[in-house]
Amino acid sequence: MITGIGHVAYEVADMEKALDFYCGKLGFADAFELKHPETGAPWIRYIKVAPGQFIELFYGRQGENPGGSYSHLCLKVDDIQAIAAQMREKGAPLDNPPSQGSDGNWQCWTHDPDGNRIEFMQMMPDSLQSRAER
């Protein structure tokens, strides 16, 4: 079952300007940063909006994108295997099977008819997001 929105993700051209906007101007908290699992380079900054709600800021947007910098919508679920099974049963696209991400949570992906990416995420008690809540 879907339990809420976990995060909205954007690709940003200038992380310092983005952090100034979301943290400095809007007052959200800079919760933590994920390093890329293959390169170790800075990859994603998590901005805490409210308990259990985050904005993901991805490093490295290249050039100007007239369509904006939307990356994906994340929906929190209580059972990642059940949502994957539901997607298959209903004939909806499942872009990848459930897997554990770098943050410690379980995830799988789909897309809407227009190609907008949607992530399903089962939050784990010891994930980076859960630790940021403490």
Give the label of every model feature segment.
Residues 36-39, 63-65, 99-102:
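A short beta-turn/loop motif at secondary-structure boundaries
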Residues 5-13, 44-48, 63-134, ...:
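Vicinal oxygen chelate
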Residues 52-55, 115-117:
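Short, charged/polar, Gly/Pro-enriched secondary-structure boundary elements
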Residues 58-63, 122-124:
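Acetyl-CoA-dependent GNAT
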Residues 1-17, 71-73, 124-134:
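N-terminal beta-strand motif that seeds the catalytic metal site of vicinal oxygen chelate
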Residues 9-53:
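Core segments of cupin and vicinal oxygen chelate
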